[in-house]
UniProtKB/Swiss-Prot annotation:
Lineage: Eukaryota, Viridiplantae, Streptophyta, Embryophyta, Tracheophyta
Residue stretches making up the Protein kinase domain: 786-1074
Protein name as it appears in the record: LRR receptor-like serine/threonine-protein kinase RGI1
Location of the active site: D919
Gene Ontology CC: plasma membrane
Membrane protein topology class: Single-pass type I membrane protein
Ligand binding (ATP): I792, G793, K794, G795, C796, S797, G798, V799, V800, K814
Glycosylation site residues: N71, N116, N227, N272, N320, N368, N443, N464, N523, N617, N664
Membrane spanning stretches: 727-747
Post-translational modification Phosphotyrosine, affected residues: Y868, Y906, Y962, Y969
UniProt LRR repeat ranges: 80-104, 105-128, 130-152, 153-176, 178-200, 202-225, 226-249, 250-273, 275-297, 298-321, 322-345, 347-369, 370-392, 394-417, 418-441, 443-464, 465-489, 490-513, 514-537, 538-561, 563-585, 586-609, 610-634, 636-657, 658-682
């Protein structure tokens, strides 16, 4: 073979060999792709549980097509065929994170958001070194943020918001040097904000808000994050001052630190944040003045500083913030006049300065704010005239200036504000007539002009304002007749013309106002008969025409008003008999027919009004006959006035109306004895005088015992009965004491045996341990702490121990009493639902900031243990009674009550199925280090599903003094039972007394004692009585909420969601329109609650004989005042002390 041929052959062989090698490598790679391990991991993960068919349908992943880079949804791959992005959003998977994430070697983006992920964040996440974006937001993840994330040096975005993550923010996160976004809001994180975050100079977004337990000061090092555009720390417990270093954040656009515990002054350095657009610092404890440097923020659009303690005035420089759209400075202590420079803010849409101390006049320059939509100036000291120039604000929808010192007339030009929806100028000194043009505003829903000195007629144009929902013109000097055009107000639900000088008849057209819920025409000079069309208003809840000159008969058709809860016809000239049809008004709570010319007998049908609980006033009429026996059915009634009539007969029907607190039967012709009960023995002579045949001088005693079904007995019978009762009481008491002593002895003996047995069986039977959190201790460490010196409490379900474990943690351990069973072990395993299984089942499914954190449980055959966070301040009960409440000022008590209400509302309304606690009491509300409340002891907790609610229980549910009354006769437990128990706790917190307290006269229940004292400030704990008037007002409102909770009828109690809402609003109460945004409610529905609108003088509501001094009445009115809630309007109607809504 020639050399040339040899060389050619050698060259060809090499090429052929290289080709074969390339084909082999390609085939190997293809085979590797077909056996893609990443695809197998994802497929196995997706099918590791049973996703819903609807969720699974969104995935086209299958085991046959093992090439995710070509076909699979939610997956993106690199050109080499490796997965780089997993992007799954809003798909309910209910899975934990894949276990083998480090196997995804090229993964750069992992987004699984809104997917109901469960479990914890695995440490292995830190091995996905290529990750740039990690978004696991809006899931159900628990546990700590793993420290291993600090190894992700390429990470730019970390989004873990809206989970249930606990623990601290890892300081080592600062090692992620490329991090731009750190978003952790709405979790359960604790601890302080790491100072190390200041090392992340590239950080653009920090959002940590909504973590209530994050505390400490805002680190000044945050100012070193020079690229920061968003800083969100709202709704946390950060405290201290705002660091001046925030002024170094030249790129900052949003500063959101509201609803925290920060204090001190607003640093003037914020004026250096030239890019700032949104400044949210409301609901804090900031003091000092608004810095003038705020005027340097020329890009600022939203300035919210409401509910702080700011003083001084609004700086004139604010007019330089030419882009401002919203200003809210309400609920501060600001003073001075409104600067005229406000008129330079041409983009301003909302200007709210309510509830301050501003004075001076409304500047006319404000009319230059041509974009203005809301103008709220209420509750200040502003004087002078309302500028007519306001009529040029054609976009204005809401104008509140009530409770000021304005004078002059209402400018007719306001009628040019064609978009106006709500106008409230109440409680000023306005004069003149009501401009007729206001009733030409087609969008006006609320017109309130209460308590001024307006005169003239009600404009005939009233019928043109068809959108009106609330019209309140009370307490003015308006004359003339009510226009018939009122019948065109088809949406009106609240009509108040009270305390004016109106005369003539009420037009029949009022019956066309089909949405009316309240009519108040009291204190006028109206005459004629009550128009029959009123009876067609099926939704009417309150009808008050008292103190007029109405005559004729009371229409029998009023009986058709089944929604009516207050009917007040007193101080008129009504004649004839009381219609028997009123007995059909089953919802009536107050019936006042006093001071008329009514005759005939009291109809027995009034006894059918089962909800009549406030008052029945029939005084000062010409009624005759006897008290019908059916009146005894009014067992809820509080006030009864039958005085100044011609009634006769005995008082037997009144003997068993158990809830009566006020009774006046003076100046009648009653005869016989007085029923021998507590009410009659406490009556004053004035309530009985004028009855010549009652308790005549020939009788030895005025009191006789009334026995149901047997009438009145004589005095000798009463004496013998009392002696017999005393003898029986002594015998029963002695028997009970002996039984208790015997039971204690037996229990102690059994407990000693059980302790010995547990000690022995602890070695024989294996312990099982189920943690619900990440725990660093063993069962052995817990067991050795279960000794008598460590006992910190005993309850109906077990003994609670303090356990100091080796890692320095302190936890609380409840050792449950053994289950009481009948039968063998198999029957016990199958049938018994003791407190252990109830607590584990309940606590394992709930997480809330005001419910004690359940750490885990462990058990063997004889011993069952539950582990919780330890609460260093003990229980609410111990703080109130063992330490005499000295450490609890009003603010702390309020916070505890609100937190407990929110926790209980979570159990009732946010758990599926709802959870009834069954043993709410002061000792089951634990107090944390910062006096935050935690609901504890679910030993009697019961899951309530649709088939179980209201079912009779076989065990006593609750603790003595806290148990709802219906349990005694029905054995039924519902959420409303918890509401009652919570109401008792509120009374306990306010009064400082236990439910059954030795200091309460005659040993009556706390609820009854508070009711008897009718809202007097004297019921408050002595340490609270010296508080400010504003705080006293809050306390009396909370007391009123408590009385709603302890209503004897479960159906009449509010829900815990309503209670929490009422309590929350009491602290920030701004009467009817506190923080209302009518931009979001263009046409409020007719069902809007009315309690905040009703400021009726209580003296006009109840019989004169039942009224006390005006000071006492003001206290009682404060008692039930509350703001907007979903609770029924009727329950709070006529309870506000305010005359303005």
């Amino acid at each position: 073979m020639s050399l040339h041929s040899l060389i050619f052959f050698s060259s060809s062989s090499s090429s052929l060999l290289f080709s074969f090698f390339f084909i082999f490598i390609f085939c190997f790679s293809l085979s590797d792709a077909e056996q893609n391990p990443e695809a197998s991991i994802l497929y196995s993960w997706l099918h590791s549980s049973s996703p819903t068919p609807s969720s699974l349908s969104l995935f086209n992943w299958n085991s046959i097509d093992n090439t995710p880079c070509n076909n699979w949804t939610f997956i993106t791959c690199s050109s080499q065929g490796f997965i780089t992005d997993i992007d799954i959003e809003s798909v309910p998977l209910q899975l934990s994170l894949p276990k083998n994430l480090p196997a995804f070697r090229s993964l750069q983006k992992l987004t699984i958001s809104g997917a109901n992920l469960t479990g914890t964040l695995p440490e292995s996440l830190g091995d996905c070194l290529g990750l740039k974006v990690l978004d696991l937001s809006s899931n159900g993840l628990v546990g700590d943020i793993p420290w291993s994330l600090s190894k992700l040096r390429n990470l730019e975005t970390l989004i873990l918001n809206s989970n249930q993550l606990t623990g601290k923010i890892p300081p080592d996160i600062s090692k992620c040097s490329k991090l731009k976004s750190l978003i952790l809001f709405d979790n359960l994180l604790t601890g302080s904000i790491p100072t190390e975050l200041g090392k992340l100079s590239g950080l653009e977004v920090i959002r940590i808000g909504g973590n209530k337990e994050i505390s400490g000061q805002i680190p000044s090092e945050i100012g070193d994050c020079s690229n920061l555009t968003v800083l969100g720390l709202a709704e946390t417990s950060v405290s201290g001052n705002l660091p001046s270093s925030l002024g170094k954040l030249k790129k900052l656009e949003t500063l959101s630190i509201y609803t925290t515990m920060i204090s001190g002054e607003i640093p003037s350095d914020l004026g250096n944040c030239s890019e700032l657009v949104d400044l949210f610092l409301y609901e804090n404890s900031l003091s000092g003045s608004i810095p003038r440097e705020i005027g340097q923020l020329t890009k600022l659009e939203q300035l919210f500083l409401w509910q702080n303690s700011l003083v001084g005035g609004i700086p004139e420089e604010i007019g330089n913030c030419s882009n401002l759209k919203m200003i809210d400075l309400s609920l501060n202590l600001l003073s001075g006049s409104i600067p005229s420079s406000i008129g330079r803010l041409s983009f301003l849409e909302e200007f709210m300065i309510s509830d301050n101390k501003f004075s001076g006049s409304i500047p006319t320059t404000i009319s230059n704010c041509s974009s203005l939509v809301q103008l709220q100036l209420d509750k200040n000291q502003i004087s002078g005239l309302i500028p007519s120039e306001l009529g040029t604000l054609t976009k204005l929808t809401l104008f509140f200036a009530w409770s000021n010192q304005l004078e002059g007339s209402i400018p007719p030009g306001l009628a040019d504000c064609t978009d106006l929806q709500a106008l409230d100028l109440s409680r000023n000194s306005l004069t003149g007539t009501i401009p007729s043009g206001l009733f030409m505003l087609r969008n006006l829903t609320k017109l309130l002009l209460i308590s001024n000195s307006l005169s003239g007629f009600i404009p005939q144009e009233i019928g043109n304002c068809s959108s009106l929902v609330r019209l309140r013109l009370g307490f003015n000097r308006i004359t003339g007749e009510i226009p018939s055009g009122i019948g065109s107000l088809k949406k009106i639900n609240f009509l108040d013309f009270s305390s004016n000088r109106l005369h003539g008849k009420v037009p029949d057209e009022i019956g066309s106002c089909s949405e009316l819920q309240m009519i108040d025409l009291s204190n006028n000079s109206l005459e004629g008969s009550l128009p029959n069309p009123v009876s067609s208003l099926s939704g009417l809840q309150v009808l008050d025409v008292s103190a007029n000159q109405f005559s004729g008969k009371i229409p029998a058709s009023l009986g058709r008003l089944v929604s009516l809860n207050k009917l007040i016809l007193s101080k008129n000239l009504f004649s004839g008999s009381i219609p028997t049809s009123l007995g059909m008004c089953s919802g009536l709570q107050l019936l006042d027919l006093g001071s008329n010319e009514l005759s005939g007998e009291i109809p027995s049908e009034l006894g059918d009004i089962e909800n009549l609980e406030i008052a029945l006033n029939l005084s000062s009429n010409r009624l005759t006959g006897k008290i019908p026996s059916k009146i005894a059915s009014l067992n809820k009634l509080s006030i009864l006035d039958l005085s100044h009539n011609m009634l006769e007969g005995d008082l037997a029907p009144l003997a068993n109306i158990e809830n009566l607190v006020s009774l006046n039967i003076s100046y009648n012709s009653f005869s016989g004895y007085l029923p021998d009960n507590k009410l009659f023995r406490q009556l004053s002579p004035q309530d009985l005088e004028g009855n010549k045949k009652l308790c005549s001088s020939t009788q030895d005693s005025c009191f006789l015992t009334y026995r149901k079904g047997n009438g009145l007995g004589d005095d000798g019978d009463a004496s013998r009965t009392r002696k017999l009762r005393l003898t029986l009481a002594l015998l029963i008491t002695l028997t009970v004491v002996l039984m208790i002593l015997g039971a204690v002895a037996v229990i102690r003996a059994r407990r000693n045996i059980d302790n010995e047995r547990d000690s022995e069986l602890g070695e024989t039977y294996k312990w099982q341990f189920t943690p619900f959190q990440k725990l660093n201790f063993s069962v052995d460490q817990i067991i050795r702490c279960l000794v008598e010196p460590n006992v910190i409490g005993k309850g109906c379900s077990g003994v609670v121990y303090r356990a100091d474990v080796d890692n320095g943690e302190v936890i609380a351990v409840k050792k449950l009493w053994p289950a009481m069973v009948n039968g063998g072990h198999d029957e016990k395993t199958k049938n018994v639902r003791d407190s252990f299984s109830a607590e584990v089942k309940t606590l394992g499914t709930i997480r809330h900031k005001n419910i004690v954190r359940f750490l885990g449980c462990c058990w063997n055959r004889n011993t069952r243990l539950l582990m919780y966070d330890y609460m260093p301040n003990g229980s609410l009960g111990s703080l109130l009674h063992e330490r005499r409440g000295s450490s609890l000022d009003w603010d702390l008590r309020y916070r505890i009550l609100l937190g407990a209400a929110q926790g209980l509302a979570y159990l009732h309304h946010d758990c599926l199925p709802p959870i009834v606690h069954r043993d709410i009491k002061a000792n089951n509300i634990l107090i944390g280090l910062d006096f935050e409340p935690y609901i504890a002891d679910f030993g009697l907790a019961k899951l309530v599903d649709e088939g179980d609610i209201g079912r009779c229980s076989n065990t006593v549910a609750g603790s003595y003094g806290y148990i709802a009354p219906e349990y005694g006769y029905s054995m039924k437990i519902t959420e409303k039972s918890d509401v009652y128990s919570y109401g008792v706790v509120v009374l306990e917190v306010l009064t400082g007394k236990q439910p059954i307290d030795p200091t309460v006269p005659e040993g009556i229940h706390l609820v009854d004692w508070v009711r008897q004292n009718r809202g007097s400030l004297e019921v408050l704990d002595s340490t609270l009585r010296s508080r400010t008037e504003a705080e006293a007002d809050e306390m009396m409102q909370v007391l009123g909420t408590a009385l709603l909770c302890v209503n004897s009828s479960p159906d009449e109690r509010p829900t815990m969601k309503d209670v929490a809402a009422m309590l929350k609003e009491i602290k920030q109460e701004r009467e009817e329109y506190a923080k209302v945004d009518l931009l979001l409610k263009k046409s409020p529905p007719p069902t809007t609650t009315m309690q905040e609108e009703c400021r009726k003088n209580e003296m006009m509501m109840i019989p004169a004989a039942a009224a006390s001094s005006s000071k006492e009445m003001r206290r009682e009115e404060r008692l039930l005042k509350s703001n907007n809630t979903s609770f029924s309007a009727s329950s709070l109607l006529y309870s506000s002390s305010s005359s303005i809504e």
